[in-house]
């Protein structure tokens, strides 16, 4: 009898996990589009500027443009980037800036920086603009070329694949 219960337990557990996969698309609606040149990085003197602005109505090469707010109900999107500084031995090491000034959008700073684009007051444009004041030295910026909607609850999450 114990052997029968043991086999029955294994069979039930197997049936429960048969339908589980690692694909989020089965559980959450996602939409991925590609639009180039949405993240801009520029330097002037000791100030590095990172910006990312795009219209709420996104033309991405399809016949019908995508209304990001109606699709996601999200007032914010984000992308991640990190910085590295060359040390005295010539090696690149991770650098976390301490002087960030966001004129549009917001930042979340950890081991990398999350640039958060926010929908403007007129609900027409998602905006992000940040200046980073740097001390003398050589720097490089590594940008993850993916912009993702934040807080898309019970609706579609949109991912914008882009270039810098």
Show where each model-derived region lies.
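C-terminal motif of bacterial Sec signal peptides marking the signal peptidase cleavage site
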Residues: 16-19
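Sec-dependent signal peptide recognition
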Residues: 3-10
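Short beta-strand segments of immunoglobulin-like
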Residues: 36-43
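Short edge beta-strand/loop segments characteristic of extracellular beta-sandwich folds
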Residues: 51-55
